[in-house]
């Protein structure tokens, strides 16, 4: 029986598409500057958008003057990124179709009364299907408004006990442990979802560390933010400040943002420079720069690191209410990150959230509800 072979990928278009389908092959320095990894394992090439079109430093483009696979890959990636940016609008999920037959010919059909909440029921006028949809809050005993109110109260500064008392005034009898369970469940749901959304962050990032208590022991929270939009990019908790390898923080930021910053601003911690050289530095120009702000005075980068200190202040205030964290892998810090990026408006951004400054619009009066519904629907 004759052997059959898979067809070879021969055209530049196919090779370019193959590059985009592999993770970590294209790194964006800015909107018009990219680095594409060599597919033969020999370093990388610079792809740049100019007034005369796209240019690449690879031999195929330099010698033949053709649109190489690296340019094609960047253009495909660029088009996809622009399409995603243009459509990153999260709206509240509204029931419009029957889950059985798909028709839009539905109408409300009474209320289902549970012990702690009421759920709207619907009927399909075509197939007769009766249904209720509670996206993101299925099998939950309490009203979604009570759950999201608890998250708003907690992340805006209230303790679990005070949140419990506030909910009681609203008619929701719930234990502080149940509230803690809600926070864990929905924080992880939202964080997993928003990490897949590509925020349009700037090209200057800042990293800093702050000490926190976990089970009474001193730990350090390392955080990475975008200077322009205040978007909190990444975080990690370390046992030590000076012995910690910050490469994990920078690597996570690079992976989530799908780019390398033009400038990284940090304090004088040596591990930052080591991590920068490992994760961000390249011989390909334009090279990313590491600015040690603590050594600079009267400098454009050294604004006393105020933008970073604001996040540190938020964490400090939150930690006082929590009286310390219980475990290193706590979801609370991730919840604070979601709250900071998507819920809390910032005066320095003219009342917008960092996510809105990055082109991600979360609509609806209850943004917690919108995020949870969209995250649940995307699973």
Locations of the language-model features?
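Long, low-complexity, compositionally biased intrinsically disordered regions
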Residues: 1-123, 169
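Short, positively charged, Gly/Tyr-enriched micro-motifs
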Residues: 116, 120-204, 209-216, 229
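Acidic/histidine-rich, metal-coordinating catalytic segments
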Residues: 260-272
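Short glycine-rich loop/turn motifs
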Residues: 44, 217-223
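C-terminal domain-tail junction helix/linker
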Residues: 317-379
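Active-site beta-loop-alpha junctions of metal-dependent nucleic acid enzymes
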Residues: 140-142, 235-257
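RNase H-like two-metal-ion nuclease catalytic core shared by retroviral integrases
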Residues: 117, 292-316
């Amino acid at each position: 029986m004759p052997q059959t072979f898979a067809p070879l990928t021969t055209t530049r278009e196919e090779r370019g598409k193959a590059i985009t389908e592999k993770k970590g092959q294209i790194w964006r320095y800015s909107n018009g500057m990219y680095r594409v990894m060599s597919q033969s394992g020999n370093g990388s090439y610079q792809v740049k958008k100019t007034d005369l079109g796209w240019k690449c430093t690879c031999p195929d483009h330099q010698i033949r003057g053709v649109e190489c696979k690296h340019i094609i890959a960047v253009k495909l990636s660029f088009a996809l990124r622009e399409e995603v940016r243009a459509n990153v609008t999260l709206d509240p999920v509204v029931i419009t179709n029957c889950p059985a037959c798909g028709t839009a010919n539905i109408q409300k059909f009474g209320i289902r009364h549970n012990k702690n909440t009421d759920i709207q029921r619907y009927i399909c006028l075509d197939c007769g299907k009766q249904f209720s949809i509670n996206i993101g809050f299925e099998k939950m005993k309490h009203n979604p408004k009570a759950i999201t109110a608890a998250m708003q109260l907690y992340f805006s500064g209230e303790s679990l006990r005070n949140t419990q008392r506030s909910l009681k005034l609203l008619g929701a009898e719930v234990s502080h442990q149940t509230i803690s369970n809600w926070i864990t469940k929905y924080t992880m749901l939202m964080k997993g979802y928003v990490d897949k959304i590509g925020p349009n962050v700037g090209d200057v990032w800042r990293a800093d560390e702050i000490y926190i208590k976990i089970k009474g022991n001193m730990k350090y929270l390392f955080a990475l933010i975008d200077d322009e939009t205040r978007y909190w990019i990444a975080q990690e908790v370390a046992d030590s400040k000076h012995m910690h390898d910050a490469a994990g923080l920078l690597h996570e930021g690079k992976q989530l943002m799908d780019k390398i910053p033009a400038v990284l601003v940090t304090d004088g911690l040596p591990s930052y420079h080591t991590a920068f050289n490992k994760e961000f530095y390249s011989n390909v120009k334009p090279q990313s720069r590491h600015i040690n702000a603590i050594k600079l005075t009267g400098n454009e980068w050294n604004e006393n690191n105020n933008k970073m200190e604001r996040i540190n202040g938020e964490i400090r205030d939150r930690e006082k209410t929590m009286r310390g964290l219980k475990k290193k892998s706590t979801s609370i810090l991730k919840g604070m990150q979601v709250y900071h990026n998507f819920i809390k408006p910032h005066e320095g951004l003219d009342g917008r959230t960092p996510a809105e400054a990055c082109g991600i619009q979360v609509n609806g009066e209850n943004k917690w509800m919108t995020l949870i519904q969209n995250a649940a629907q995307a699973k």
